[in-house]
Swiss-Prot record:
Residues 29-130 form the GOLD domain. Pfam families: EMP24_GP25L. The gene is ERP6. Keywords: Endoplasmic reticulum, ER-Golgi transport, Membrane, Protein transport, Signal, Transmembrane, Transmembrane helix, Transport. Disulfide bonds: none annotated. GO terms for biological process: endoplasmic reticulum to Golgi vesicle-mediated transport; Golgi organization; intracellular protein transport. Residues 1-19 form the signal peptide. This is Protein ERP6. It comes from Saccharomyces cerevisiae (strain ATCC 204508 / S288c). Residues 205-216 are cytoplasmic. The chain crosses the membrane at residues 184-204. It comes from the Eukaryota. GO terms for cellular component: COPII-coated ER to Golgi transport vesicle; endoplasmic reticulum; endoplasmic reticulum membrane; endoplasmic reticulum-Golgi intermediate compartment; Golgi apparatus; membrane; mitochondrion. It is found in: Endoplasmic reticulum membrane. The lineage of its organism: Eukaryota, Fungi, Dikarya, Ascomycota, Saccharomycotina.
Length: 216
């Protein structure tokens, strides 16, 4: 029973999130200490910006010129390094604590080409939670995405049904138009034929009349 309440407490508690930023120069190394329990998942996201004199503000640098080096060390085990990752100026990383204790997370801006002593701004956000909780969150996200995909598929089916209905209406309208045009054409031909017959008949009648009158 007690374990059930503990599980509920873990589920209901939000993830611990901490976000901050600091200023420095290219090549500076900044470290943070985190006390983590066993099977705790630490997720970090970072964004490195470099001061641009033309913009008079900080902006994302070229991936060819700058990068980030990420190290995670176990302080309780003589600073044994368990993570060494090199990334782009903007990205994320994750780490699963295999043992309970204090961990040191270090980020160092890396300058690939010599561009002088440039001022930098590093934004970092840590998210700490149990792996099962994060898996649950990912599952909920996938279910939400699946629901959105189902809605989109339903809308696509409705659109296709409307398109099919429009095609059927267009075909019906085209058949009616062709039928009307065909009838109009035959009615015109009939009228012309009748006019020709009437003209011929009138010509014969006039000719017969003039013959009787001895005009022709």
């Amino acid at each position: 029973m007690l374990s059930h309440y503990i599980f509920l407490a873990f589920v209901l508690l939000p993830f611990r999130v901490s976000a901050f930023y600091f200023y420095g120069y290219g090549g500076d190394r900044k470290c943070f200490l985190k006390e983590l329990s066993k099977d705790t998942l630490l997720k970090g996201s970072y964004n490195l910006e470099v001061y641009d004199d033309k913009l008079a503000d900080y902006a994302l640098p070229s991936y060819n010129d700058y990068g980030i080096v990420i190290d995670v060390e176990e302080v309780f085990d003589n600073n044994h390094r368990v993570v060494h990752q090199q990334g782009s100026p903007s990205g994320d990383f994750s780490f699963l604590a295999l043992e309970s204790g204090e961990y040191k997370i270090c980020l160092q801006s890396r300058v690939n080409n010599w561009v002088g002593k440039t001022k930098t701004k590093l934004e970092i956000e840590f998210e700490v939670g149990f792996e099962a909780m994060l898996d649950m969150q990912r599952k909920e996200t996938l279910e939400s995405l699946h629901g959105k995909v189902s809605i989109l598929n339903s809308k696509i089916v409705d659109i296709r049904r409307e398109q099919q209905l429009m095609r059927e209406r267009e075909e019906s309208f085209r058949d009616i138009s062709e039928s009307v045009n065909s009838r109009a054409m035959w009615w015109t031909v009939t009228q012309v034929t009748l006019l020709i017959i009437i003209c011929v008949w009138q010509m014969k009648s006039l000719r017969s009349f003039f013959v009787k009158q001895k005009v022709l």
